[in-house]
A protein has these predicted regions:
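Beta-strand-rich binding/interaction modules
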Residues: 25-27, 116-158, 165-169
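Short, hydrophobic beta-strand segments
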Residues: 46-48, 168-173
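Charge-dense, low-complexity intrinsically disordered segments
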Residues: 73, 159-161
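Short beta-strand segments of immunoglobulin-like
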Residues: 105-115
Length: 173
């Protein structure tokens, strides 16, 4: 696996959309991590394991024999292996926290919905993997069904190097 040279200044993530039942990930012979559960995604920051001077070796060991991982039993056979997509992604040093349960790092819910009013809750985390502080602008835009902008909200934030910033925004309309 040869990585582009322009990825050297980025964070590199490996995401498995699903591998049943237990997966162990290795890069260049070094263990990156494990994930148990064949129905959920997992994401690993593989940046410290990447080589940009030579091709990389990526190995994913998948084991479906484990009896301690739900579902414990069923009336059918649990086939093993990687059965959904695998993604390799490079992002800037400041990014949404991608290793948060294999998500994209943003969670949107509608805790209150009626004919008169709706509430949208947006939450997540931003990670600064750089050594220095970063000044960022967090913006969310809510669109009407016709594509016009219903609401925009901006927030200026500063994140120290190596820190994780949690955000939570609730809007009502």
């Amino acid at each position: 696996l040869t990585l582009p040279q322009n990825w050297q200044t980025k964070q590199v993530f490996l995401k498995l959309d699903a591998a049943s039942k237990a997966a162990t990930i290795y890069m260049n012979g070094r263990k990156i991590g494990e994930h148990n559960g064949g129905y959920t995604a997992c994401t690993f920051d593989i940046t410290p394991f990447c080589s940009f001077d030579a091709p990389n070796s990526l190995a994913i060991h998948v084991d479906n024999a484990r009896q301690d991982i739900p579902p414990i039993s069923a009336d059918f056979t649990f086939f093993g292996g990687i059965y959904r997509d695998v993604w390799l992604t490079a992002v800037p040093k400041q990014h949404f926290h991608l290793t948060n349960y294999g998500s994209e790092g943003i969670f949107i819910s509608t805790p209150q919905v009626s004919e008169e009013k709706g509430t949208i809750l947006i939450r997540g985390e931003i990670k600064n993997d750089a050594e220095q502080k970063a000044s960022l602008e967090l913006e969310h835009i809510i669109y009407n069904p016709d594509g016009s902008i219903a609401q925009t909200q901006k927030q200026s934030i500063q994140i120290k190097g190596g820190e994780l910033y949690s955000f939570r925004t609730e809007t009502a309309r």
